[in-house]
Amino acid sequence: MAYLRRAATALVLIFQLHLFLSLSNAHNITRILAKDPDFSTFNHYLSATHLADEINRRQTITVLAVDNSAMSSILSNGYSLYQIRNILSLHVLVDYFGTKKLHQITDGSTSTASMFQSTGSATGTSGYINITDIKGGKVAFGVQDDDSKLTAHYVKSVFEKPYNISVLHISQVLTSPEAEAPTASPSDLILTTILEKQGCKAFSDILKSTGADKTFQDTVDGGLTVFCPSDSAVGKFMPKFKSLSPANKTALVLYHGMPVYQSLQMLRSGNGAVNTLATEGNNKFDFTVQNDGEDVTLETDVVTAKVMGTLKDQEPLIVYKIDKVLLPREIYKAVKTSAPAPKSSKKKPKNAEADADGPSADAPSDDDVEVADDKNGAVSAMITRTSNVVTAIVGLCFGVWLM
């Protein structure tokens, strides 16, 4: 029995190590800033603009925090929440700068990308921040788009976790004409126009042909997440789409929208079933969001689609590109669950037999065999990975037992 105790001890140690490694890489900017009330306004707007979610998602980040007094300078200008998001995204650097690194900048000056730059919101290099080590040990910051004026200086370090996250207090808000520029209000965000400009014209066309575009557009103000299949995926699916009834066509299109804004970080942290625009009464029309590392997949029980990237992120609207058309089980479940009808002792007329055996108008055809094969392959791969993990654990346990 001693070897069993050793094996159990090894398993506990492995679990604790895994838990420690997971927690050691995590950070929460909201909790970090909540420790100092001087940053309460800055902290509030990081959450309100969902920048906090993006900060927590990244493994290497620097936040240039400003106190309540400095924040009042931009709030008094009456900027919209979307403008404030752009301005604050200049304060999030996608590289690590601790106090030590600030004073060891090569040649005394450098420029680094902010989140305003890395997310594609900025044009050219207008989202870069200039950092300069001035004589006397002072460090100054300025937006490259603002004639590289050094408008703020380093005050103190708030929190540092080397090479993961650094929170530095700076004296003034960093801003620029481009960041302050008015952004489109939700009612100005025309979804079909956005889709057509972002390589989703085929999906935009079926939105309009079914009349579902109005439902999507009417939902934008309250929050909308759209999963847009690529043009090639829609093109491959069109023969089956054309065979659907009008009601099922509309339901399938609505199935690609969620009536809530969900950033990529929210999707990654919220595994489970989600409702869609097609959800109504007993018709669930939901699918499951699953995460595997950095990858996000959408599982419908009929097909699994992968999120390929973000096409548009302007709260309250976000649009993702996916690699497959989402097929709801409410439309295709008959194909998955139906069994052959019992043979009748009476012979049927030839034409009736043909009608009974023929595929239904809404049934998937050849491609659905491929979907089934894909699922079997995924299960096989999962079994293989599980087997490898078990083998590794057994090996470790055996090693501990031998000690």
From Swiss-Prot:
Residues 1-26 form the signal peptide. Residues 338-371 are annotated as: Disordered. The gene is FLA2. Belongs to the fasciclin-like AGP family. The keyword Membrane applies. Induction: Down-regulated by abscisic acid (ABA). May be a cell surface adhesion protein. PROSITE patterns: FAS1. It comes from the Eukaryota. InterPro entries: FAS1_dom_sf, FAS1_domain, Plant_FLA. Gene3D superfamilies: FAS1 domain (2.30.180.10). This is Fasciclin-like arabinogalactan protein 2. It is a lipid-anchor; GPI-anchor. Residues 27-174, 187-326 form the FAS1 domain. GO terms for cellular component: cytosol; plant-type vacuole; plasma membrane; side of membrane.
